[in-house]
Regions:
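Charged catalytic and DNA/RNA-contacting regions of genome-maintenance
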Residues: 1-274, 278, 283, 287-303, ...
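Short, surface-exposed charged micro-motifs
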Residues: 65, 412-416, 424
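Active-site proximal loops enriched in glycine and acidic residues that flank catalytic Cys/His/Asp
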Residues: 112, 417, 428-429
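Short, charged amphipathic alpha-helical segments flanked by flexible coils
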Residues: 263-270, 431, 435-449
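Cytosolic, long alpha-helical scaffolding segments
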Residues: 354, 360, 424-439
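Flexible, glycine/threonine-enriched loop-and-boundary segments that flank and lead into catalytic domains
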Residues: 395-415
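Extended, charged coiled-coil "arm/hinge" scaffolds of SMC/Rad50-like chromosome-maintenance ATPases
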Residues: 445, 449-468
Length: 468
Protein backbone atom coordinates (compact mmCIF):
# COMPACT_ATOMS: atom_id res chain seq x y z
CA UNK A 1 0.00 0.00 0.00
CA UNK A 2 1.19 3.63 -0.37
CA UNK A 3 3.27 4.61 2.66
CA UNK A 4 1.30 7.82 3.18
CA UNK A 5 -1.96 5.89 3.75
CA UNK A 6 -0.60 2.92 5.70
CA UNK A 7 -2.19 4.07 8.98
CA UNK A 8 -5.68 3.78 7.50
CA UNK A 9 -5.11 0.20 6.36
CA UNK A 10 -3.42 -0.73 9.65
CA UNK A 11 -6.36 0.55 11.69
CA UNK A 12 -8.84 -1.54 9.68
CA UNK A 13 -6.80 -4.73 9.89
CA UNK A 14 -5.95 -4.42 13.59
CA UNK A 15 -9.63 -3.81 14.37
CA UNK A 16 -10.32 -7.18 12.71
CA UNK A 17 -7.73 -8.83 14.98
CA UNK A 18 -5.19 -9.35 12.20
CA UNK A 19 -1.39 -9.02 12.43
CA UNK A 20 0.40 -6.91 9.81
CA UNK A 21 4.05 -7.16 8.70
CA UNK A 22 5.65 -3.85 7.68
CA UNK A 23 8.31 -4.26 5.01
CA UNK A 24 10.71 -1.42 4.17
CA UNK A 25 13.50 -0.83 1.68
CA UNK A 26 16.87 -1.27 3.43
CA UNK A 27 19.30 -1.53 0.50
CA UNK A 28 21.14 1.34 -1.18
CA UNK A 29 19.47 2.37 -4.44
CA UNK A 30 22.77 3.66 -5.82
CA UNK A 31 24.64 0.37 -5.41
CA UNK A 32 21.80 -2.14 -5.86
CA UNK A 33 21.77 -4.40 -8.91
CA UNK A 34 18.21 -5.37 -9.68
CA UNK A 35 15.49 -5.03 -7.02
CA UNK A 36 16.55 -3.13 -3.90
CA UNK A 37 16.76 -5.27 -0.74
CA UNK A 38 13.74 -5.13 1.53
CA UNK A 39 13.05 -6.67 4.92
CA UNK A 40 10.32 -6.92 7.51
CA UNK A 41 11.18 -4.25 10.07
CA UNK A 42 8.17 -4.63 12.34
CA UNK A 43 5.05 -6.71 12.87
CA UNK A 44 1.99 -4.85 14.15
CA UNK A 45 -0.33 -7.03 16.24
CA UNK A 46 -3.33 -6.22 18.49
CA UNK A 47 -1.27 -6.77 21.66
CA UNK A 48 1.87 -4.84 20.68
CA UNK A 49 0.49 -1.53 19.42
CA UNK A 50 2.47 1.64 20.07
CA UNK A 51 1.06 3.97 17.39
CA UNK A 52 -1.14 6.72 18.78
CA UNK A 53 -3.40 6.51 15.72
CA UNK A 54 -4.17 2.85 16.47
CA UNK A 55 -4.73 3.16 20.22
CA UNK A 56 -7.47 4.74 22.27
CA UNK A 57 -6.17 7.33 24.75
CA UNK A 58 -7.95 5.52 27.58
CA UNK A 59 -7.09 1.91 26.72
CA UNK A 60 -3.97 -0.22 26.80
CA UNK A 61 -2.88 -2.80 24.23
CA UNK A 62 -1.96 -5.69 26.52
CA UNK A 63 -0.11 -8.80 25.43
CA UNK A 64 -0.69 -11.85 27.66
CA UNK A 65 1.18 -15.16 27.55
CA UNK A 66 -0.39 -18.19 29.25
CA UNK A 67 1.70 -21.27 30.10
CA UNK A 68 -0.03 -24.56 30.87
CA UNK A 69 1.92 -25.99 33.82
CA UNK A 70 1.59 -29.27 35.71
CA UNK A 71 -0.82 -29.99 38.55
CA UNK A 72 -3.58 -27.91 36.91
CA UNK A 73 -1.56 -24.71 37.32
CA UNK A 74 -0.93 -21.80 34.95
CA UNK A 75 1.88 -19.32 34.54
CA UNK A 76 0.94 -15.82 33.35
CA UNK A 77 3.07 -12.98 32.03
CA UNK A 78 1.69 -9.82 30.47
CA UNK A 79 2.99 -6.55 29.17
CA UNK A 80 1.88 -3.27 27.68
CA UNK A 81 4.71 -2.34 25.30
CA UNK A 82 4.07 1.36 25.93
CA UNK A 83 4.28 0.95 29.72
CA UNK A 84 7.43 -1.14 29.93
CA UNK A 85 6.40 -3.29 32.92
CA UNK A 86 6.32 -7.11 32.85
CA UNK A 87 3.65 -8.50 35.17
CA UNK A 88 3.95 -12.05 36.50
CA UNK A 89 1.39 -14.29 38.19
CA UNK A 90 0.59 -17.94 38.81
CA UNK A 91 -2.84 -19.42 39.35
CA UNK A 92 -4.92 -22.58 39.27
CA UNK A 93 -6.44 -23.39 35.90
CA UNK A 94 -9.97 -22.91 37.24
CA UNK A 95 -8.99 -19.33 38.21
CA UNK A 96 -7.77 -18.48 34.71
CA UNK A 97 -11.05 -16.93 33.56
CA UNK A 98 -11.01 -14.41 36.42
CA UNK A 99 -7.39 -13.50 35.70
CA UNK A 100 -8.11 -12.94 32.01
CA UNK A 101 -11.08 -10.72 32.93
CA UNK A 102 -8.84 -8.75 35.27
CA UNK A 103 -5.98 -8.34 32.78
CA UNK A 104 -8.26 -7.63 29.78
CA UNK A 105 -5.68 -8.60 27.12
CA UNK A 106 -5.77 -7.50 23.51
CA UNK A 107 -3.82 -10.56 22.39
CA UNK A 108 -3.21 -13.91 24.06
CA UNK A 109 -0.22 -16.19 23.42
CA UNK A 110 -0.34 -19.90 24.16
CA UNK A 111 1.84 -22.89 23.37
CA UNK A 112 1.18 -24.92 20.25
CA UNK A 113 1.95 -27.95 22.42
CA UNK A 114 -0.78 -27.39 25.02
CA UNK A 115 -3.30 -30.16 25.59
CA UNK A 116 -6.50 -30.15 23.50
CA UNK A 117 -8.54 -29.75 26.69
CA UNK A 118 -6.63 -26.62 27.72
CA UNK A 119 -6.84 -25.14 24.23
CA UNK A 120 -10.58 -25.79 24.19
CA UNK A 121 -10.83 -24.01 27.54
CA UNK A 122 -9.02 -20.91 26.22
CA UNK A 123 -11.00 -20.76 23.01
CA UNK A 124 -14.19 -21.31 24.99
CA UNK A 125 -13.44 -18.26 27.14
CA UNK A 126 -13.16 -16.12 24.03
CA UNK A 127 -16.29 -17.59 22.47
CA UNK A 128 -18.20 -16.97 25.70
CA UNK A 129 -17.48 -13.25 25.40
CA UNK A 130 -14.80 -13.07 28.09
CA UNK A 131 -12.85 -10.58 26.01
CA UNK A 132 -12.19 -9.56 22.41
CA UNK A 133 -8.57 -10.69 22.36
CA UNK A 134 -6.90 -12.25 19.37
CA UNK A 135 -5.31 -15.67 19.78
CA UNK A 136 -1.76 -16.63 18.70
CA UNK A 137 -0.06 -20.01 19.05
CA UNK A 138 3.70 -20.00 19.65
CA UNK A 139 6.24 -22.85 19.46
CA UNK A 140 6.36 -24.97 22.59
CA UNK A 141 10.11 -24.46 23.09
CA UNK A 142 9.57 -20.72 23.65
CA UNK A 143 7.74 -21.49 26.91
CA UNK A 144 10.94 -22.33 28.77
CA UNK A 145 11.36 -21.30 32.42
CA UNK A 146 15.15 -21.04 32.21
CA UNK A 147 14.95 -18.86 29.10
CA UNK A 148 12.32 -16.68 30.74
CA UNK A 149 14.43 -16.12 33.84
CA UNK A 150 17.45 -15.17 31.72
CA UNK A 151 15.40 -12.75 29.63
CA UNK A 152 13.95 -11.08 32.73
CA UNK A 153 17.42 -10.69 34.25
CA UNK A 154 18.68 -9.16 30.99
CA UNK A 155 15.81 -6.66 30.93
CA UNK A 156 16.37 -5.72 34.58
CA UNK A 157 20.17 -5.84 34.27
CA UNK A 158 20.20 -7.78 37.53
CA UNK A 159 21.80 -10.95 38.87
CA UNK A 160 18.70 -12.20 40.71
CA UNK A 161 14.93 -11.76 40.70
CA UNK A 162 14.74 -11.99 44.49
CA UNK A 163 14.43 -8.21 44.90
CA UNK A 164 11.14 -8.39 42.98
CA UNK A 165 9.96 -11.54 44.81
CA UNK A 166 9.91 -13.21 41.41
CA UNK A 167 12.69 -15.77 41.73
CA UNK A 168 10.48 -18.80 42.55
CA UNK A 169 7.81 -18.31 39.87
CA UNK A 170 9.04 -20.86 37.34
CA UNK A 171 5.64 -21.23 35.64
CA UNK A 172 5.41 -17.46 35.17
CA UNK A 173 9.02 -17.43 33.91
CA UNK A 174 8.00 -19.86 31.16
CA UNK A 175 5.21 -17.51 30.09
CA UNK A 176 7.62 -14.53 30.25
CA UNK A 177 10.00 -16.29 27.84
CA UNK A 178 7.32 -16.49 25.14
CA UNK A 179 6.04 -13.00 25.96
CA UNK A 180 9.39 -11.22 25.61
CA UNK A 181 10.46 -13.28 22.58
CA UNK A 182 7.23 -12.37 20.78
CA UNK A 183 7.39 -8.69 21.77
CA UNK A 184 10.98 -8.38 20.54
CA UNK A 185 10.08 -10.17 17.31
CA UNK A 186 7.16 -7.86 16.55
CA UNK A 187 9.10 -4.67 17.30
CA UNK A 188 12.13 -5.85 15.33
CA UNK A 189 14.51 -4.97 18.16
CA UNK A 190 15.16 -5.36 21.88
CA UNK A 191 12.97 -3.58 24.45
CA UNK A 192 15.38 -1.27 26.34
CA UNK A 193 12.55 0.56 28.13
CA UNK A 194 11.19 -2.61 29.76
CA UNK A 195 13.02 -2.32 33.07
CA UNK A 196 10.43 -3.26 35.69
CA UNK A 197 8.82 -6.46 36.89
CA UNK A 198 5.73 -6.60 39.05
CA UNK A 199 4.44 -9.77 40.68
CA UNK A 200 0.69 -9.97 41.20
CA UNK A 201 -0.71 -12.44 43.70
CA UNK A 202 -4.41 -13.21 43.96
CA UNK A 203 -4.37 -12.88 47.76
CA UNK A 204 -3.07 -9.30 47.38
CA UNK A 205 -6.08 -8.25 45.30
CA UNK A 206 -9.75 -7.93 46.19
CA UNK A 207 -11.45 -11.02 44.83
CA UNK A 208 -13.92 -9.95 42.17
CA UNK A 209 -15.31 -12.96 40.26
CA UNK A 210 -16.17 -12.45 36.62
CA UNK A 211 -19.92 -12.37 37.35
CA UNK A 212 -19.38 -9.64 39.95
CA UNK A 213 -17.31 -7.57 37.52
CA UNK A 214 -20.00 -7.81 34.88
CA UNK A 215 -22.83 -6.91 37.27
CA UNK A 216 -20.87 -3.97 38.71
CA UNK A 217 -20.33 -2.73 35.13
CA UNK A 218 -16.81 -1.56 35.99
CA UNK A 219 -15.64 -0.88 32.45
CA UNK A 220 -18.35 -2.53 30.36
CA UNK A 221 -22.13 -2.55 30.59
CA UNK A 222 -24.19 -5.72 30.67
CA UNK A 223 -24.94 -5.05 27.00
CA UNK A 224 -21.22 -5.02 26.19
CA UNK A 225 -20.89 -1.24 25.76
CA UNK A 226 -17.52 0.21 26.73
CA UNK A 227 -17.42 3.64 25.08
CA UNK A 228 -16.52 6.69 27.17
CA UNK A 229 -20.17 7.80 27.26
CA UNK A 230 -21.46 4.35 28.31
CA UNK A 231 -23.02 4.11 31.81
CA UNK A 232 -20.08 2.31 33.47
CA UNK A 233 -18.34 3.01 36.77
CA UNK A 234 -15.17 3.91 34.90
CA UNK A 235 -16.98 6.44 32.70
CA UNK A 236 -18.56 8.00 35.80
CA UNK A 237 -15.27 8.34 37.70
CA UNK A 238 -13.05 9.26 34.79
CA UNK A 239 -12.53 13.01 34.93
CA UNK A 240 -8.79 12.63 34.25
CA UNK A 241 -7.11 15.33 32.18
CA UNK A 242 -4.76 12.92 30.38
CA UNK A 243 -4.98 9.52 28.75
CA UNK A 244 -2.27 8.31 31.13
CA UNK A 245 -4.48 9.13 34.10
CA UNK A 246 -7.50 7.41 32.56
CA UNK A 247 -5.52 4.24 31.91
CA UNK A 248 -4.17 4.22 35.47
CA UNK A 249 -7.68 4.67 36.88
CA UNK A 250 -8.94 1.75 34.79
CA UNK A 251 -6.14 -0.50 36.05
CA UNK A 252 -7.01 0.45 39.65
CA UNK A 253 -10.64 -0.53 39.05
CA UNK A 254 -9.76 -3.85 37.43
CA UNK A 255 -7.13 -4.84 40.02
CA UNK A 256 -8.09 -3.25 43.38
CA UNK A 257 -5.51 -4.08 46.11
CA UNK A 258 -6.49 -5.52 49.48
CA UNK A 259 -3.87 -3.43 51.28
CA UNK A 260 -5.77 -0.73 53.19
CA UNK A 261 -2.62 1.37 53.36
CA UNK A 262 -2.68 1.84 49.59
CA UNK A 263 -6.25 3.17 49.73
CA UNK A 264 -5.39 5.40 52.69
CA UNK A 265 -2.42 6.90 50.84
CA UNK A 266 -4.62 7.75 47.88
CA UNK A 267 -7.28 9.32 50.12
CA UNK A 268 -4.63 11.33 51.99
CA UNK A 269 -3.22 12.64 48.71
CA UNK A 270 -6.72 13.60 47.58
CA UNK A 271 -7.36 15.45 50.86
CA UNK A 272 -4.10 17.42 50.56
CA UNK A 273 -4.82 18.40 46.97
CA UNK A 274 -8.37 19.56 47.70
CA UNK A 275 -7.52 21.32 50.95
CA UNK A 276 -9.89 22.18 53.79
CA UNK A 277 -12.08 24.34 51.56
CA UNK A 278 -12.26 21.81 48.75
CA UNK A 279 -10.59 24.20 46.30
CA UNK A 280 -6.91 23.52 46.93
CA UNK A 281 -4.08 22.87 44.51
CA UNK A 282 -6.01 20.27 42.53
CA UNK A 283 -7.73 22.86 40.28
CA UNK A 284 -4.45 24.53 39.26
CA UNK A 285 -2.84 21.12 38.74
CA UNK A 286 -5.72 20.05 36.49
CA UNK A 287 -5.31 23.24 34.48
CA UNK A 288 -1.60 22.54 34.12
CA UNK A 289 -2.37 19.01 32.86
CA UNK A 290 -4.93 20.15 30.28
CA UNK A 291 -3.72 19.24 26.81
CA UNK A 292 -0.64 17.42 28.11
CA UNK A 293 0.96 14.94 25.70
CA UNK A 294 1.04 11.20 26.33
CA UNK A 295 4.59 11.02 27.69
CA UNK A 296 4.31 7.32 28.48
CA UNK A 297 3.66 6.38 24.86
CA UNK A 298 6.12 8.90 23.40
CA UNK A 299 8.99 7.66 25.57
CA UNK A 300 8.19 4.04 24.66
CA UNK A 301 8.20 4.89 20.96
CA UNK A 302 11.48 6.75 21.46
CA UNK A 303 13.08 3.67 23.04
CA UNK A 304 11.79 1.54 20.15
CA UNK A 305 13.07 4.08 17.58
CA UNK A 306 9.57 4.63 16.20
CA UNK A 307 9.11 8.18 17.45
CA UNK A 308 8.20 10.98 15.05
CA UNK A 309 9.71 14.49 15.13
CA UNK A 310 6.52 16.19 16.29
CA UNK A 311 6.18 13.69 19.13
CA UNK A 312 9.62 14.78 20.34
CA UNK A 313 8.44 18.39 20.26
CA UNK A 314 5.41 17.31 22.31
CA UNK A 315 7.80 15.60 24.74
CA UNK A 316 9.78 18.84 24.99
CA UNK A 317 6.64 20.72 26.03
CA UNK A 318 5.64 17.91 28.41
CA UNK A 319 8.99 18.09 30.23
CA UNK A 320 8.40 21.79 30.84
CA UNK A 321 4.95 20.97 32.26
CA UNK A 322 6.42 18.22 34.43
CA UNK A 323 8.89 20.64 35.97
CA UNK A 324 6.09 23.09 36.79
CA UNK A 325 3.95 20.30 38.28
CA UNK A 326 6.86 19.13 40.44
CA UNK A 327 7.34 22.65 41.81
CA UNK A 328 3.61 22.93 42.60
CA UNK A 329 3.60 19.62 44.46
CA UNK A 330 6.76 20.46 46.39
CA UNK A 331 5.09 23.70 47.49
CA UNK A 332 2.53 21.56 49.35
CA UNK A 333 5.40 20.23 51.53
CA UNK A 334 4.41 16.56 51.17
CA UNK A 335 5.96 14.20 53.68
CA UNK A 336 8.69 11.86 52.41
CA UNK A 337 7.33 8.41 51.61
CA UNK A 338 3.83 9.65 50.83
CA UNK A 339 2.18 9.34 47.43
CA UNK A 340 2.50 13.07 46.71
CA UNK A 341 6.10 13.11 47.92
CA UNK A 342 6.96 10.37 45.45
CA UNK A 343 5.09 12.12 42.64
CA UNK A 344 6.94 15.39 43.24
CA UNK A 345 10.23 13.52 42.96
CA UNK A 346 9.24 11.46 39.89
CA UNK A 347 8.00 14.53 38.01
CA UNK A 348 11.37 16.27 38.18
CA UNK A 349 12.55 16.25 34.53
CA UNK A 350 15.89 14.58 33.70
CA UNK A 351 18.78 17.02 33.68
CA UNK A 352 19.63 18.54 30.29
CA UNK A 353 16.95 16.47 28.49
CA UNK A 354 14.60 19.38 27.80
CA UNK A 355 17.59 21.59 26.98
CA UNK A 356 18.83 19.08 24.40
CA UNK A 357 15.39 18.82 22.78
CA UNK A 358 15.14 22.62 22.60
CA UNK A 359 18.61 22.88 21.07
CA UNK A 360 18.27 19.95 18.65
CA UNK A 361 14.79 20.37 17.14
CA UNK A 362 13.15 23.06 15.05
CA UNK A 363 10.09 24.70 16.58
CA UNK A 364 7.85 23.17 13.90
CA UNK A 365 9.62 20.15 12.39
CA UNK A 366 8.37 18.04 9.50
CA UNK A 367 5.97 15.21 10.24
CA UNK A 368 8.50 12.56 9.14
CA UNK A 369 12.29 12.39 9.42
CA UNK A 370 12.66 11.44 5.75
CA UNK A 371 11.13 14.80 4.74
CA UNK A 372 14.01 16.71 6.36
CA UNK A 373 13.46 19.95 8.25
CA UNK A 374 13.79 18.40 11.71
CA UNK A 375 17.20 19.24 13.20
CA UNK A 376 17.85 22.86 14.20
CA UNK A 377 20.69 24.90 12.72
CA UNK A 378 23.87 25.01 14.78
CA UNK A 379 23.64 21.51 16.24
CA UNK A 380 25.92 19.78 13.73
CA UNK A 381 28.47 21.58 11.54
CA UNK A 382 28.44 18.92 8.79
CA UNK A 383 24.64 18.99 8.59
CA UNK A 384 24.69 22.79 8.41
CA UNK A 385 27.18 22.58 5.52
CA UNK A 386 25.05 20.05 3.63
CA UNK A 387 21.91 22.07 4.26
CA UNK A 388 23.69 25.19 2.99
CA UNK A 389 24.75 23.34 -0.17
CA UNK A 390 21.18 22.25 -0.82
CA UNK A 391 19.84 25.76 -0.23
CA UNK A 392 22.52 27.58 -2.24
CA UNK A 393 22.91 25.07 -5.08
CA UNK A 394 21.67 27.41 -7.84
CA UNK A 395 23.93 30.22 -6.66
CA UNK A 396 26.97 27.92 -6.70
CA UNK A 397 26.24 26.68 -10.23
CA UNK A 398 25.81 30.23 -11.53
CA UNK A 399 29.06 31.32 -9.87
CA UNK A 400 30.95 28.29 -11.27
CA UNK A 401 29.56 28.94 -14.75
CA UNK A 402 30.73 32.57 -14.63
CA UNK A 403 34.21 31.56 -13.45
CA UNK A 404 34.58 28.80 -16.06
CA UNK A 405 33.52 31.13 -18.89
CA UNK A 406 36.22 33.59 -17.84
CA UNK A 407 38.85 30.84 -17.41
CA UNK A 408 38.19 29.02 -20.71
CA UNK A 409 36.94 31.84 -22.92
CA UNK A 410 33.92 29.69 -23.91
CA UNK A 411 31.06 32.20 -23.98
CA UNK A 412 28.24 29.66 -24.41
CA UNK A 413 29.47 27.23 -21.69
CA UNK A 414 26.70 26.04 -19.37
CA UNK A 415 26.74 24.37 -15.93
CA UNK A 416 23.59 22.28 -15.37
CA UNK A 417 22.06 19.30 -13.58
CA UNK A 418 19.69 16.46 -14.42
CA UNK A 419 18.56 13.44 -12.40
CA UNK A 420 20.10 10.93 -14.80
CA UNK A 421 23.64 12.28 -15.23
CA UNK A 422 23.97 14.62 -12.26
CA UNK A 423 25.97 17.86 -12.55
CA UNK A 424 27.89 18.66 -15.73
CA UNK A 425 29.53 21.39 -17.83
CA UNK A 426 28.21 21.46 -21.41
CA UNK A 427 30.39 22.67 -24.28
CA UNK A 428 29.26 22.82 -27.94
CA UNK A 429 31.22 21.00 -30.67
CA UNK A 430 32.66 24.22 -32.07
CA UNK A 431 34.31 25.14 -28.75
CA UNK A 432 35.88 21.77 -27.82
CA UNK A 433 39.38 22.96 -28.70
CA UNK A 434 39.20 25.37 -25.74
CA UNK A 435 38.40 22.68 -23.15
CA UNK A 436 41.06 22.62 -20.35
CA UNK A 437 42.95 19.45 -19.39
CA UNK A 438 41.15 19.12 -16.02
CA UNK A 439 37.78 18.58 -17.75
CA UNK A 440 36.69 14.92 -17.68
CA UNK A 441 34.19 13.75 -20.32
CA UNK A 442 30.87 12.61 -18.83
CA UNK A 443 28.58 12.33 -21.89
CA UNK A 444 28.73 12.83 -25.67
CA UNK A 445 25.77 14.36 -27.50
CA UNK A 446 25.18 15.07 -31.19
CA UNK A 447 26.19 18.74 -31.01
CA UNK A 448 27.90 19.00 -27.62
CA UNK A 449 30.03 17.30 -24.99
CA UNK A 450 29.37 17.22 -21.26
CA UNK A 451 32.23 17.34 -18.77
CA UNK A 452 32.87 17.40 -15.05
CA UNK A 453 35.74 18.95 -13.07
CA UNK A 454 37.19 17.92 -9.68
CA UNK A 455 35.52 20.95 -8.07
CA UNK A 456 32.12 20.13 -9.56
CA UNK A 457 32.49 16.44 -8.64
CA UNK A 458 33.20 17.36 -5.01
CA UNK A 459 30.14 19.62 -4.96
CA UNK A 460 28.01 16.89 -6.59
CA UNK A 461 28.94 14.34 -3.90
CA UNK A 462 28.01 16.77 -1.14
CA UNK A 463 24.81 17.91 -2.86
CA UNK A 464 23.55 14.36 -3.40
CA UNK A 465 24.36 13.36 0.18
CA UNK A 466 22.57 16.50 1.36
CA UNK A 467 19.41 15.33 -0.43
CA UNK A 468 19.67 11.94 1.25
Amino acid sequence: VPFHSVETYLARLIKLGESVALCEQVGDVATAKGPVERKVVRVVTPGTLTDTELLSDKSEAILLAVHQAGKNRCGLAWLSVTQGVVHLAECAQDELADWIDRIAPSELLASAGMTPTFEQKLRGLKTAGRGSWSFALRPDFQFDAGLGQRKLLEQLQAASLAAWSADALSDAHAAAAALLTYAEHTQGRSLPHVQRVQVQRSDALIDLPASTRRNLELTQTLRGESASDSPTLFALLDTCMTGMGSRLLKSWLLSPPRDRQVAQQRLQAQAVLRGDSGSGAWSSLREQLKGASDVERITARTALRQVRPRELVALRHALARAGALSVQLQALNPEPGTLLGGMARWLTPPKHCAELLHMALLEEPSALVRDGGVIADGLDAELDELRGIQTNCDAFLLDLETREKERTGIANLRVQFNKVHGFYIEVTQGQLDKVPDDYRRRQTLKNAERFITPELKTFEDKALSAQE
